[in-house]
Amino acid sequence: MKFELFREVALTRDFPEHQLRAGDVATLVDFVPHPSGGENGCVLEISNAVGKTIAVITAPLSAIEPLGPNEILTVRSLAPTANVPA
C-alpha cells in the first residue's frame, strides 16, 4: 500500500511504551528505509485532542493503515507520564 506524507493514519497495533493503542490516529511525517533490507518504516507524529504533539515515533509500515470513509474518530484519556508535556 502506498501512503502519502502528512496524511492521518490509524495504528494497527499497540505501542505501550508510548501509551498508544491500535486505532489511535497519527500523522505520517516521513518514510524510513530499513538499513538491512527488512521492512521499511515511517515516522509518525501523535497529537492530543487539541492538536498538541505528544509523541513522535518510528514504526514499521505494517503498523499503520489509512483512515476510511466509514470510520469515526473517538476520544480516550491518556494517563500522564514524564514523556507527555503538560
Question: Where do the language-model regions lie?
Answer:
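Basic/aromatic-rich interaction segments and small domains that mediate binding to polyanionic partners
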Residues: 3-67, 72-75, 79-80, 86
